[in-house]
Every structure is written in C-alpha cells, then in structure tokens.
A protein has these predicted regions:
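Hydrophobic, lipid-facing positions within transmembrane beta-strands of outer-membrane proteins
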Residues: 30, 60-64, 110-114, 156-162, ...
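Transmembrane beta-barrel strands of outer-membrane/channel proteins
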Residues: 30, 34-38, 78-82, 130-136, ...
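Residue-level signature of outer-membrane beta-barrel architecture
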Residues: 36, 68, 80, 118-120, ...
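Surface-exposed strand-loop-strand hairpins of Gram-negative outer-membrane beta-barrel proteins
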Residues: 38-61
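Outer-membrane beta-barrel translocator domains and adjoining extracellular loop/strand segments
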Residues: 42-50, 88-95, 140-148, 188-194, ...
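Repeated loop/turn-to-beta-strand initiation elements of outer-membrane beta-barrel proteins
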Residues: 73-78, 124-128, 170-175, 207-211, ...
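Outer-membrane pore/translocation modules
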Residues: 88-185, 191, 232, 237
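Outer membrane beta-barrel transmembrane domains
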Residues: 201-287
Length: 287
C-alpha cells in the first residue's frame, strides 16, 4: 500500500493549476507563477475513510504555472513541476533517541499538465468555458529504494472540465464566484474520476490585496483494477476521494508583480494524506 498512497495528492497539485480557470486571458495577455508547494504527514485517510498513522512522509514541489491568451476565446495553460522531492524522515526511538529506520529522499521532474481553454459564452457578469487538460506522465512512478517515492503516477490522463464564473455585490462590496465540474479519464488501470469545485474571492486596497476561499471535491468511479490499499499515506494513489477546503492571499506590489500564500487541507477522504499543504509563490501579469 505504501506505493499506492504516495500517489494521491496529485489532485492537490492540479487544484492550483486551475486557480484562474474561469477568467480567460485576452489575446497577448498572460498570468505566470513560480511556486513552492509542501506537504508533510504522519497520518492518512484509509480506503474506508478512517485516519491511521504512518511514518512521517512528505513531498516538496517547485513548479511553474502559465496561462496565455492565443485569442480572446482561446487560452493555453501549463503546469510544470520541474523539481519534486518525495521523502521519508528518520524513525527515532522516543525512549533511547536511537535511529530505528533511516530516512530516504528521491528527487526528479514531476508530472506535467498541459491544457487548452475555450470560451463558451460571456455576457454581462457571467462567463462559461471548457478546458481539455492532458496529464503527462513525466515524473517517476517507481522512485526510491522500494519504488514508493514517486514523483508521478506513470499514467496519461485526459480531463474535460466545464467552468462557470460570475461577479456579484455583497454589503456594497464586489466579489467573484467560480465553479467547475469535470471528468478525468485515467489509464493504466487507474479508476476514472469526477471532480468539482467552488471558489469565492474579493479584493481590497484598490485591487492590490486579493483574498479567496475554495473547496474541491474528487470522487472515484472505482472502475480501475489497480490496488488502492496503502498503509503509509500517499499523493498519487488509485481510488482517491476527498473534500478539501483552503484559501489564498495575494498581494500585488506593482501592477504586474505580486506574491501569494496558500493553504489547503482535506476535511474528509480516502487513500490520501490527512495533513494540510502550503504554497508560496511569485506571479507576473503580462499585459
């Protein structure tokens, strides 16, 4: 099971990939972000939804995200984790302080996501679009001495999503809302998935400060034959199911440059780490 739960938080990686999904960039404009993402856990959700302990494991990720307007109706999107570290800490006796089991780490390139987005409809405050995303197995699905330190899941997947976005006022203050629903067709005996999410945000200080809250959900169709059992937690497993909540704060210190901080955590799940993830990044707006 060690090998299959080290594969499940891939979905958490791709949540950030779609942060700006409902707002297409105009022709020649773009949004680019360099981020560091981290998660460390000593417990995980089992395949029955209970929480069990595991050796402390973690994943650290450096990635580039980009979205560029080919036209006002077509955008290209890329998520490139150019450095992924999968590791396990030393196991130390609480009585003698002796190292019982040496830790291990494995570094490599991660799985990329490449997508194209098309505007279906836009009128007044409402916008609708669709995204086709290809999950490229550019990471290592058998990393480390026992093959459990993966930086990718080894399978090529195709995800189709429908997005809806709107703006509204509350207490005379402007907000935006986003939602999506999608289907992820997975290969190599992984189960297909249904995904959905919501996001609400607003800005302050003349648009320099952005605050947002989001929730994401994934449900497995359980139509794959790959074993989902795991006793050690994971970020790329089969039959992952969870509901996560989180938020992000971003500050634009110039018209084109800014910093962001993010936090996300699963509040329920199956075959996934039971611990929060943290992200920090710097972004550039091409206008």
């Amino acid at each position: 099971m060690k090998k299959s739960i080290i594969l499940s938080l891939l979905f958490v990686f791709t949540c950030q990939f779609f942060t700006h999904a409902q707002w297409l960039e105009k022709k020649g404009n773009g949004y680019f972000k360099l981020s560091a993402w981290s998660l460390e856990a000593d417990q995980h959700y089992t395949n029955s939804g209970k929480i069990d302990p595991n050796a402390t494991r973690g994943v650290f990720n450096l990635n580039l995200y980009g979205k560029y307007g080919l036209s006002d109706n077509w955008n290209v999107i890329a998520y490139i984790p150019f450095f992924v570290k999968s590791y396990q800490n030393h196991q130390v006796s609480s009585v003698t302080n002796e190292t019982l089991l040496e830790g291990e780490a494995f570094n490599s390139f991660g799985d990329m996501d490449l997508g194209i987005e098309y505007r279906l409809f836009k009128k007044s405050k409402h916008a609708f679009s669709t995204i086709l995303t290809l999950g490229i197995p550019s990471g290592d699905s058998k990393g480390g001495s026992d093959g459990s330190y993966q930086t990718g899941d080894g399978e090529f997947n195709q995800q189709l999503r429908f997005n809806a976005g709107t703006s509204f006022s509350l207490f005379k203050h402007s907000f935006y809302g986003k939602s999506y629903v999608g289907f992820n067709n997975k290969t190599k005996n992984f189960s297909d998935e249904v995904k959905a999410g919501l996001e609400v945000g607003t800005s302050f200080v003349g648009g320099k400060l952005l605050l947002l809250a989001r929730s994401n959900m994934v449900r497995s169709l359980k139509n794959g034959s790959l074993n989902a059992s795991n006793n050690n937690g994971s970020i790329f497993a089969n039959n992952v199911e969870f509901i996560s909540i989180g938020g992000e704060v971003a500050w634009k210190f110039t018209k084109k440059l800014g910093l962001s901080l993010g936090y996300h955590s699963a509040i329920s799940g199956k075959v996934i780490y039971a611990a929060p993830s943290y992200e920090a990044g710097i972004f550039y707006l091409l206008k």
